[in-house]
Amino acid sequence: MEKWWFNSMLSNEELEHRCGLSKSMDSLGAIGNSSGSEDPVINDTDKNIHSWSDIDSSSYSNVDHLFGVRNIRNFISDDTFLVRDRTGDSYSIYLDIENEIFEIDNDRSFLSELESYFSSYLNNRSKSDTHYYDRYMYDTKYTWNNHINSCIDSYIRSEISIDSYISSGSDNYDNYSDSYISSYICSESVINSSDSGSYSIRTSTSTNGSDFNIRGRYNDLDINKKYRHLWIQCENCYGLNYKKFFRSKMNICEQCGYHLKMSSSDRIELSIDPGTWDPMDEDMVSIDPIEFHSEEEPYKDRIDSYQRKTGLTEAVQTGIGQLNGIPIAIGVMDFQFMGGSMGSVVGEKITRLIEYATNGSLPLIIVCASGGARMQEGSLSLMQMAKISSASYDYQSNKKLFYVSILTSPTTGGVTASFGMLGDIIIAEPNAYIAFAGKRVIEQTLNKTVPEGSQAAEYSFHKGLFDSIVPRNLLKGVLSELFQLHGFFPLNQNSIK
């Protein structure tokens, strides 16, 4: 969506224009400056202002001259015009020709003619022989690039008097960066707020240098929702990350470096060499052992729902593979499946994985991401803590094998109290939320405020809770060095990276 800012001469008494409207309206250059002033941006002399009443309106209304309806192709199908009147008040005009939408953000009486006229125009236009119908606009595809080029050419010819900017994603924009118009086009920061439907614009070339906060009647999120699937918003800085490249960036925010949640499949792809992954116990599913009663949704239905949503059978994936050529056994929990909660199936799969690693003398990695024990399975889920810990004891103490625990955000509850903290080496991701009880539970139980950041990985690291904080982009190399340090080497020495 393109945004235009005009220092328009609009008042409550009459609509006025910055230049003579008797000029040709073949382009947006109709809104221009023909005075020859050295500074067209701040030139507000009376000789350049013509009242609507000075224009012959026998054929067209005032609105015709303001928007150049005879050549409506000068507007693309989705434009927002940001306008300031000479009293200093600001408002926006939103025009969407394709969807027949015309809105003004302030219900001012002197704008009623404008809104009612254009609404009528959009609703009643027809392919008749009238001066309102623009055949070029409706009969052919007027491309974005052609629109940008024609606008810039028009602006250069008429030395347009625009206060700030045109902001677009056109590739052709850079081709004009050294031209005359570049002095009137500047980079602006438009901060969208999906909650309030408002945006803030800083006009760096404004005469008073002030900020204008303009609230529209429409919601920007609704207007741009067809583009939302292209972006992922950071939970920390709220910056946008292009979804197509986000996976290759290991779900790390490009703006602030925050580590967002990853699916278990993505983590396996990150850690395991291509073509070496061999999953275990994929057909193991829960059968609602205690027939948990729920008024909202039966436990079985909820399991089925998450299976369809994630493509997984349970909240953990286990299997064997190679990490830089080193054979390993690995289990990866997935928070997207019922919050990574540990039920009987999760406990059984991890226990079998540890036993397989014990029998095969393989190094073991478990990536934790869990809210704790699964309440829908009652004491059976709590029993998994002891069950996994028992298998881990045999693996570590009796067989003297090497177990690395990786704590990601969040790792809480029964997972923290059992195998999450039993690793020979415990690694945490940056800014990971690691705790036994959550902040809300502690505050409600003890009636005390939990200090901000006291359950973050960095705070726990300084208290000695685990061994290292390793970013995702370095994790595979760190693990490879740890395994080799403990006597686990690649099957093929050429696999070392």
UniProtKB/Swiss-Prot annotation:
Pathway: Lipid metabolism; malonyl-CoA biosynthesis; malonyl-CoA from acetyl-CoA: step 1/1. One of its GO terms (molecular function) is carboxyl- or carbamoyltransferase activity. One of its GO terms (cellular component) is chloroplast stroma. Keywords: ATP-binding, Chloroplast, Fatty acid biosynthesis, Fatty acid metabolism, Lipid biosynthesis, Lipid metabolism, Metal-binding, Nucleotide-binding, Plastid, Transferase, Zinc, Zinc-finger. Disulfide bonds: none annotated. HAMAP family: AcetylCoA_CT_beta. This is Acetyl-coenzyme A carboxylase carboxyl transferase subunit beta, chloroplastic.
